[in-house]
Swiss-Prot record:
It comes from the Viruses. The lineage of its organism: Viruses, Duplodnaviria, Heunggongvirae, Peploviricota, Herviviricetes. SUPFAM superfamilies: RING/U-box. This is Putative zinc-binding protein ORF12. Gene3D superfamilies: Zinc/RING finger domain, C3HC4 (zinc finger) (3.30.40.10). Keywords: Metal-binding, Zinc, Zinc-finger. GO terms for molecular function: zinc ion binding.
Length: 299
């Protein structure tokens, strides 16, 4: 009987097992056998479909319980780093990305793309792994925003991914709840509105923090921005989970399927051990003390 988190052995057509290397991994690079370097060792129609049929016949939930690393490699877009949305496979190189991440040249290997093909089976697996959860935020949207009418006019944070948007809402409302629970408050508090065009959520946070998030949203790459929001939400969950007004179970669920669909709900996420403020401290553009979220404002 396979124990939870135990890696599954998948035999290739050459007879050798599929090996998932340490570090970054994608299935386009994995189209070679690690033992004999034989090309096209996967069965038709493509290597990813072959792997899915062999290791995930019961869906991603079952696969994740046995092989976190393999499941994460299957559902992660190699271009934006987020969970795949409407995935397509590039016929020439075998790399997979979201439909909205498609460009003329493959971001993974640099090859010009001759054709792409949708992967409806993979999309179905990802969607089915989310059944039973609030999936409203999974629709791709360019209108998911946080807005403030500040001294510099309207300032907007734009979130293209609904799942990330849900986590961002809980991050900001969590910060607002932490501040409301403290007797001593920052002097630069401002009222902002999350998602004003769909389901408005009013919050109160320090203005310098909002400016920092605006700047990060505008200047960070998609993957770094997603990591920043996820780490911030995780930090709020771990350090301030008991604060009144913070829905711990709701935030955990949003984090659950943002990190990987089908995760079993345990409060352990790989690579999410650093705190929000330590991540901010590493950003090169936080050096300006007028913008940085100083320790005095986080207590």
């Amino acid at each position: 009987m396979t124990s939870p988190r135990e890696e599954i052995t998948v035999r290739l057509s050459c007879g050798h097992p599929l090996r998932v290397p340490d570090g970054e991994f994608c299935f386009g690079d994995g189209a070679y056998c690690c033992d004999c370097d034989e090309r096209a060792v996967f069965f038709a129609p493509d290597h990813l479909t072959t792997v899915l049929s062999k290791v995930a016949p019961e869906g991603l939930d079952a696969l994740t319980e046995k092989s976190w690393k393999l499941a994460k490699a299957i559902v992660t877009c190699g271009t934006c780093g987020d969970v795949l949305y409407q995935p397509v496979i590039h016929e020439r190189c075998g790399h997979v990305c979201c439909r909205f991440c498609f460009r003329d040249k493959c971001a993974e290997c640099g090859l010009m793309r001759t054709a792409v093909r949708p992967l409806p089976d993979l999309e179905r697996l990802i969607q089915e792994s989310l059944f039973g959860h609030d999936t409203r935020g999974l629709e791709y949207s360019d209108k998911f925003t946080a807005e403030l009418m500040g001294p510099q006019g309207k300032e907007v944070i734009l979130l293209y991914d609904g799942a990330l948007g849900n986590v961002f809402v809980d991050l900001v409302t969590g910060i607002s709840a932490v501040i409301a629970d403290r007797a001593e408050k920052p002097i630069d508090l401002v009222d902002i509105v999350l998602n004003p065009d769909w389901s408005p959520v009013p919050c109160t946070i320090p203005y310098r923090l909002f400016r920092l998030l605006v700047k990060a949203n505008a200047e960070m790459g998609v993957h770094d921005w997603s990591d920043l929001v996820t780490l911030g939400a995780w930090n709020i969950l771990v350090e301030y989970g008991a604060v009144p007004g913070l829905d711990r179970s709701r935030l955990l669920e949003f984090l659950r399927y943002l990190v990987i669909p089908g995760f079993d709900g345990a409060e352990t996420f790989p690579a999410l051990t650093e705190t929000f403020l330590s991540i901010l401290a590493e950003c090169t553009w936080v050096g300006d003390s007028r913008c940085g979220y100083r320790d005095a404002c986080s207590r």
